[in-house]
Amino acid sequence: MSVAEIKKSDVVAQFARGANDTGSPEVQVALLTTRINELTVHFKAHTKDHHSRRGLLRMVSRRRKLLDYLKGKDADRYRALIEKLGLRK
């Protein structure tokens, strides 16, 4: 297993709602958040990497849409996820 696969499986295990859950909004948002955080560190060193920045903005938009969906479906799960991930300070 690569390092990325190990990190991914750890995140899925932490945020999964069930044993084989990989597609719930909580898991998807958590995976996107870890990738966004890794890219944020990358951009501190590579400020002119505009091609990757476009991908970052796309991930942020996707996370925002998933959070909006979750907020509309179940506000309690939304609040718990935001608190667990440390978003919205």
Swiss-Prot record:
GO terms for cellular component: cytosolic small ribosomal subunit. It holds the Pfam family Ribosomal_S15. The keyword Transmembrane helix does not apply. SMART domains: Ribosomal_S15. The keyword Heme does not apply. One of its GO terms (molecular function) is rRNA binding. Signal peptide: none annotated. Gene3D superfamilies: 6.10.250.3130, S15/NS1, RNA-binding (1.10.287.10). Keywords: Ribonucleoprotein, Ribosomal protein, RNA-binding, rRNA-binding. GO terms for biological process: translation. PANTHER family: RIBOSOMAL PROTEIN S15, BACTERIAL AND ORGANELLAR, SMALL RIBOSOMAL SUBUNIT PROTEIN US15M. Part of the 30S ribosomal subunit. Forms a bridge to the 50S subunit in the 70S ribosome, contacting the 23S rRNA. Belongs to the universal ribosomal protein uS15 family. One of the primary rRNA binding proteins, it binds directly to 16S rRNA where it helps nucleate assembly of the platform of the 30S subunit by binding and bridging several RNA helices of the 16S rRNA. Forms an intersubunit bridge (bridge B4) with the 23S rRNA of the 50S subunit in the ribosome. This is Small ribosomal subunit protein uS15. It comes from Paraburkholderia phymatum (strain DSM 17167 / CIP 108236 / LMG 21445 / STM815) (Burkholderia phymatum). The gene is rpsO.
